């Protein structure tokens, strides 16, 4: 049996752009992608802290160090520039792998620079 587990998480990213006329996807600063082990074209879930929307799309890498978080195409309808979002990727693991799995989690500051890397998520954690 395989279990779907969170593999990477970008916490408190600030939306810098919303481009309705692009074909689709989310553009993410490639330096952030590297820190959380996310790849171009990987499926991600995006949760908007401002309006509660949850959407799925795929990643396009952005300029490293730019801080870009841009929702493209139809996904742009679910955000406004300045919204705070959580971006998560998932992987499928056997139960044995899942018990040993350690997701990569980064917390961003208001300019989308990595503020901290968390070794794990604890219950009742507030940032």
UniProtKB/Swiss-Prot annotation:
Pathway(s) annotated for this protein in UniProt: Cofactor biosynthesis; (R)-pantothenate biosynthesis; beta-alanine from L-aspartate: step 1/1
Cofactor note: Binds 1 pyruvoyl group covalently per subunit.
One of the GO BP terms on file: pantothenate biosynthetic process
Named cofactor requirement(s): pyruvate
PTM description: Is synthesized initially as an inactive proenzyme, which is activated by self-cleavage at a specific serine bond to produce a beta-subunit with a hydroxyl group at its C-terminus and an alpha-subunit with a pyruvoyl group at its N-terminus.
Keywords: Autocatalytic cleavage, Cytoplasm, Decarboxylase, Lyase, Pantothenate biosynthesis, Pyruvate, Schiff base, Zymogen
GO molecular function, one term: aspartate 1-decarboxylase activity
Chief subcellular location: cytoplasm
Signal peptide (UniProt feature, chain positions): none
Subcellular location: Cytoplasm
GO cellular component terms, A-Z: cytosol
Catalytic activity: L-aspartate + H(+) = beta-alanine + CO2
Protein name: Aspartate 1-decarboxylase
Pyruvic acid (Ser): modified positions: 25
Functional description taken from the UniProt entry: Catalyzes the pyruvoyl-dependent decarboxylation of aspartate to produce beta-alanine.
InterPro entries in the record: Asp_de-COase-like_dom_sf, Asp_decarbox
NCBIfam families referenced in this protein's UniProt entry, alphabetically: panD (TIGR00223)
Family: Belongs to the PanD family.
